[in-house]
Curated annotation (Swiss-Prot):
EC number of this enzyme: 3.6.4.10
Enzyme class: hydrolase
Official protein name in the record: Endoplasmic reticulum chaperone BiP
Organismal lineage: Eukaryota, Fungi, Dikarya, Ascomycota, Pezizomycotina
Functional description taken from the UniProt entry: Probably plays a role in facilitating the assembly of multimeric protein complexes inside the ER. Is required for secretory polypeptide translocation. May physically associate with SEC63 protein in the endoplasmic reticulum and this interaction may be regulated by ATP hydrolysis.
Gene name, Swiss-Prot/TrEMBL: grp78
GO molecular function annotation: ATP binding; ATP hydrolysis activity; ATP-dependent protein folding chaperone; heat shock protein binding; protein folding chaperone; protein-transporting ATPase activity; unfolded protein binding
Activity control, per UniProt: The chaperone activity is regulated by ATP-induced allosteric coupling of the nucleotide-binding (NBD) and substrate-binding (SBD) domains. In the ADP-bound and nucleotide-free (apo) states, the two domains have little interaction. In contrast, in the ATP-bound state the two domains are tightly coupled, which results in drastically accelerated kinetics in both binding and release of polypeptide substrates. J domain-containing co-chaperones stimulate the ATPase activity and are required for efficient substrate recognition.
Protein's UniProt keywords contain Endoplasmic reticulum: yes
Residues annotated as signal peptide: 1-32
Organism: Neurospora crassa (strain ATCC 24698 / 74-OR23-1A / CBS 708.71 / DSM 1257 / FGSC 987)
GO biological process: chaperone cofactor-dependent protein refolding; endoplasmic reticulum unfolded protein response; ERAD pathway; fungal-type cell wall beta-glucan biosynthetic process; IRE1-mediated unfolded protein response; karyogamy involved in conjugation with cellular fusion; post-translational protein targeting to membrane, translocation; protein refolding
Family the entry assigns: Belongs to the heat shock protein 70 family.
Length: 661
């Protein structure tokens, strides 16, 4: 009776339940359907602090080297007066250009501006983050005008860099990828990551949990008996622990836990805070207000942390750190451990959680896999080994590359690469999915840690007599009441014929695909009427129109980058040529001693003219202008220098014959 006072739309009650869980074979089938003509599929670890790209060819995974010769690329984007920089080049100039250098964008993607984590983060960012419809956007000055970029656009620039690295290695265009995300990313964050891929010109075939990818990398050479594995992934910005079972090439994630807000950067921050406090006390200043000085300290703190993984102490020296004062301090490994002791210990909580969730004891763990650069810290290794009663952690995989390695294997499976036929991957959903029933109760349809893809159905009914409509409200979260969980989406099923409460049979089905994207449908068994929704958190997502605009802008930036690069190369070409000519003409033992004074003067006049032109026009000239000036200079110099060779003036002691170049 009391239920009638509630809105009809909220009334759903449980009648019965059945569920269908697809087996690993279904996953293989899903993979087989995807192996169309998509070219080489790449695997990308889109990290908070660093990103990495791999590719599988002929059964072998290759982690690719970027244009700086590095296997990992900083997840940094910067804007200077002349150009846009991505990766190493962006990070290297961060201290000198803090307000226009964007990093840690993964902390903002798919989140709301009002989210308390976002609010905490933006306090630490030297760049400006503002709200646009409660979505965080980065505000930065580009070529003299204020521009805003969504987290998807910035992430797309990083993904674009990884795509470029892969294309450079493969010598052909790349259009498809597998991208990894932390296990704790919700649907909105996963969708936003896929959108970023689209903006970068990549069709993201799969979003894979990072620990799962690391397990694939680790599990490739494992066969035979079932093994239980803890994957402890402590990266730059996120922390994930997963418990996996691996048996004869089949991976199953039994449970996952973690902290989306714990990693190497937090350890860096402790060093930064410690030394800033020390410096302020010594000099009676507040260095934290100077973004440039803090940028320098950030760079040195990260360096010191890395050094302390192999040495007992290190010295941090920064010339003209603040207000003309130098910075010089020593950091010992013991002090570093003391500064971060509570954070290191905090990493053990999720380890306890995954064991509890999967009902597995410490002694049943066969392997501990360490992933992420922060697992190089000796204290972190010692703590985890101590937790597992002295069991040694596996260190066979480069912790920075394991996730990209696994993503590349999964990419190989999807593109049908040889050597991947026997690999089956079962992933899990990170949070419980359900709907609201009478009284605001969270009724669970897919519990957290269910292997995906999966489909589950349940029969519900009306909560009031003659109720013509039901409202299906879909939530994710672990709390028993929906008000404490996250609303993903809602829709109405209308036109239910008049009937006493509890009589209509409404089947609600949840279908979760391999990327963790959810489709919910409701079907009135009496009338055959059905409605459905694909949960994509539209409120937080980009519209197709926005994505198209961003794709066009990304292409425009790529063209601008190319034009800038060509301009710089052409300018360097002219500068180097003029400089080299001047040096040669002034070298009495070389060219200068072999040409007469008049020719020498002709060349030097032409060089001066080119250098004067450079001084006046370098800032605005195009690549063609520089090439034209170089040709003009060459037209003066070439007839004079070629005269030498025709006269045999290149030197009497040269051998008569040469190999052709």
């Amino acid at each position: 009776m009391e239920h009638r006072t509630r809105s009809w739309a909220l009334g759903l009650s449980i009648l019965g339940f059945f569920a269908l869980l697809f087996s690993a074979g279904f996953v293989q089938q899903a993979h087989a359907n995807d192996t169309e003509a998509m070219g080489t599929v790449i695997g990308i670890d889109l990290g908070t602090t660093y990103s990495c790209v791999g590719v599988m060819q002929k059964g072998k995974v290759e982690i690719l080297v970027n244009d700086q010769g590095n296997r990992i690329t900083p997840s940094y984007v910067a804007f200077t007066d002349e150009e846009r920089l991505v990766g190493d080049a962006a990070k290297n100039q961060a201290a000198a250009n803090p307000h226009r250098t964007i990093f840690d964008i993964k902390r903002l993607i798919g989140r709301k501006f009002s989210d308390k984590d976002v609010q905490n983060d933006i306090k630490h960012f030297p760049y400006k983050v503002v709200s646009k419809d409660d979505k965080p956007v980065v505000k930065v000055e580009v070529k003299g005008e204020e521009k805003t970029f969504t987290p998807e656009e910035i992430s797309a620039m990083i993904l674009g860099k990884m795509k470029e690295t892969a294309e450079g290695y493969l010598g052909k265009k790349v259009t498809h990828a597998v991208v990894t995300v932390p296990a704790y990313f919700n649907d909105n964050q996963r969708q936003a990551t896929k959108d970023a891929g689209m903006i970068a010109g990549l069709n993201v075939l799969r979003i894979v949990n990072e620990p799962t990818a690391a397990a694939i990398a680790y599990g490739l050479d494992k066969t035979g008996e079932e093994r239980q594995i803890i994957v402890y992934d402590l990266g730059g910005g996120t922390f994930d622990v997963s418990l996996l079972s691996i048996e004869q090439g089949v991976f199953e994630v039994l449970s996952t836990a973690g902290d989306t807000h714990l990693g190497g950067e937090d350890f860096d921050q402790r060093i930064i805070n410690h030394f800033a406090k020390l410096f302020n006390k010594k000099h009676g200043v507040d260095v934290t207000k100077d973004a440039k000085a803090m940028g320098k300290l950030k760079r040195e703190a990260e360096k010191a942390k890395r050094t302390l993984s192999s040495q007992m102490s290190t010295r941090i020296e920064i010339e003209a750190f603040y207000d003309g004062k130098d910075f010089s301090e020593t950091l010992t490994r013991a002090k570093f451990e003391e500064l971060n002791n509570d954070l290191f210990k905090k990493t053990l909580k999720p380890v306890e959680q995954v064991l509890k969730d999967a009902k597995v004891s410490k002694s049943e763990i066969d392997d501990i896999v360490l992933v992420g650069g922060s697992t190089r810290i000796p204290k972190v290794q010692a703590l985890i080994e101590e937790f597992f009663n002295g069991k040694k952690a596996s260190k066979g995989i480069n912790p920075d590359e394991a996730v990209a390695f696994g993503a590349a294997v999964q990419a190989g499976v999807l593109s049908g690469e040889e050597g991947t036929e026997d690999i089956v991957l079962m992933d899990v959903n990170p949070l419980t999915l359900g709907i609201e029933t009478t009284g605001g109760v969270m009724t669970k349809l897919i519990p957290r840690n269910t292997p995906i893809p999966t489909r589950k159905s349940q029969i519900f009914s009306t909560a009031a007599d003659n109720q013509p409509v039901v409202l299906i409200q879909v939530y994710e979260g672990e709390r028993s009441m929906t008000k404490d969980n996250n609303l993903l989406g809602k829709f109405e099923l209308t036109g239910i014929p008049p009937a006493p409460r509890g009589v209509p049979q409404i089947e609600v089905s949840f279908e979760l695909d391999a990327n963790g994207i959810l489709k919910v449908s409701a079907h009135d068994k009496g009338t055959g009427k059905a409605e459905s929704i694909t949960i994509t958190n539209d409120k937080g997502r980009l519209t197709q129109e926005e994505i198209d605009r961003m794709v066009a802008e990304a292409e425009k930036y790529a063209e601008e980058d190319k034009a800038t690069r060509e301009r710089i190369e052409a300018r360097n070409g002219l500068e180097n040529y003029a400089f080299s000519l001047k040096n040669q003409v002034n070298d009495e033992d070389g060219l200068g001693g072999k040409i007469d004074e008049e020719d020498k003067e002709t060349i030097l006049d032409a060089v001066k003219e080119a250098q004067d032109w450079l001084e006046e026009n370098a800032a605005t000239a195009s690549a063609e202008d520089f090439d034209e000036q170089k040709e003009k200079l060459s037209n003066v110099a070439y007839p004079i220098t070629s005269k030498l060779y025709s006269q045999g003036g290149a030197g009497d002691d040269e051998p008569a014959g040469h190999d052709e170049l």
